[in-house]
Amino acid sequence: MTLEPAGEPAAWHAAPDEAAALAALIDAAAAADGVAPISGHVRDAVRSGAAQVLIDPGASPDDPAGVAVALAQDPAEVTVAPDRRRQGRGRSLVRAAVERQGAVWAYGDLPAAQALASALNLRPTRVLLQMRRPLPIEPLGYQPPAGVRIRTFQPGRDEDAFLRVNARAFASHPEQGRLDRSGLGEEMAQDWFDPNGFFLAVTDPGDELLAFHWTKVHPAEPAGQNPTGALGEIYVLGVDPAAGIRGLGSVLAERGLQYLAQRGLDTALLYVESDNAPAVRLYERLGFTVFQRNVVYRPTNQG
Ligand SMILES: CC(C)(COP(=O)(O)OP(=O)(O)OC[C@H]1O[C@@H](n2cnc3c(N)ncnc32)[C@H](O)[C@@H]1OP(=O)(O)O)[C@@H](O)C(=O)NCCC(=O)NCCS
C-alpha cells in the first residue's frame, strides 16, 4: 500500500483548502467509532492552516482515505475513513506521525488503536480520563473552612493571582501549567467564558487566592454526525500547593457543580490524568465515573 498515487510524494502541509473534505472524513470516523478521532482545537487548526496534515488521498483528493494531523509539539492525531480500514493506511499514517511528533493520541483507546499501537511497538505513556456524572447533584454539605470565603472571579482584578496559583497547582501538567496572560485573555474572550461560573476560594480577611474552580458550558450540538446535548465541565480545578488547607477542592467542586445544575445542565464532565490519584479519588467521591480513556502512545524506546 502506498500513501500517495505514483508521482506525488507524501508531504506534510497546511491544508485550509482541504479542510471541508477532512472535516467530512473526521465526522464519518466519529460517527462510526462513537468518539471523535481529532480534538476540536486541532480541527480548528486544520481549518485555519495552523496545523500540518499528511493526507492519504485514497482514490480522489476530494474524498481522502485518512489523515494525520500535527499541531505544535503535541502528539499527532490520526484517523482512517471507516470504509477504508484494514488496508495498511493507519499503519503508514501512524508511523509517519510518530516519526514527526514523537507520539500519537488515541481518543477512546479503541481496540483498533490498541492493536495498531502494539503492532508498531508503541506503548501508552499518558492516559487522560474523561469522567462524567449526571446533574443535579444532591447537596453534599462541603463548607469552606474558617478564614476562607468563596467568591467569583472578577475580570480585570483576579488574572495575575489566578495565573500564579494555576502555575503552581499545575507545575507538572503538560498543558495547563503553561497558561499565560495572553492565553488566559484568549479564553476570556470566548463566548463560553462566564465569570459567574469561575469560583475562587480566598482568605477572609485578606482576599489571598488559595484555590479556584473554573467551569465551562459546552452548548448542545444537535446537528452533525455525532449529536451531543449540552455539557457542563469542571474545566480547571486547582488548589495552591502552598495553601496548606485541606478540603478546598471538594468545596469548590461542589459549588461549581451546583452552579452547572442551576444552569439547567444534566451532565457534568471533566478530564483528569489517570495517575493523578488524589484528583481521581476526589471525583469518584463526587460520583464521577470513567466515560472515556484517551491515551498517548510513544515508541517503546522513548521515555
Ligand atoms: C486505528 C486506525 C487509524 C487504524 O487504521 P487502519 O487503516 O485500519 O489500520 P491498518 O490497516 O494500517 O492496520 C495495521 C494493523 O493494526 C492492527 N489493527 C488495525 N485495526 C484493527 C482492528 N480493528 N482489530 C485488530 N487489529 C487491528 C492490525 O495489527 C493491523 O495489521 P493487519 O491488518 O495486517 O492485521 C483506525 O481504526 C482509526 O481511524 N481509528 C479511529 C482513530 C484512532 O483511534 N486513532 C488513533 C491511532 S493510534
From Swiss-Prot:
Residues that, per the record, bind 1D-myo-inositol 2-(L-cysteinylamino)-2-deoxy-alpha-D-glucopyranoside: 175, 216, 233, 271
InterPro entries, per the entry: Acyl_CoA_acyltransferase, GNAT_dom, MshD_Acetyltransferase, Mycothiol_AcTrfase
Enzyme Commission no: 2.3.1.189
Pfam hit, one: Acetyltransf_1
Residues that coordinate or bind acetyl-CoA 2: 237-239, 244-250, 276-281
Positions with a binding annotation for acetyl-CoA 1: 78-80
EC top class, as a word: transferase
Keyword Repeat: yes
Annotated N-acetyltransferase domain residues: 148-303
Record key words, sorted: Acyltransferase, Repeat, Transferase
A single BP term in Gene Ontology: mycothiol biosynthetic process
Top-rank lineage group of the source organism: Bacteria
Family: Belongs to the acetyltransferase family. MshD subfamily.
Its job: Catalyzes the transfer of acetyl from acetyl-CoA to desacetylmycothiol (Cys-GlcN-Ins) to form mycothiol.
Name this protein carries in UniProt: Mycothiol acetyltransferase
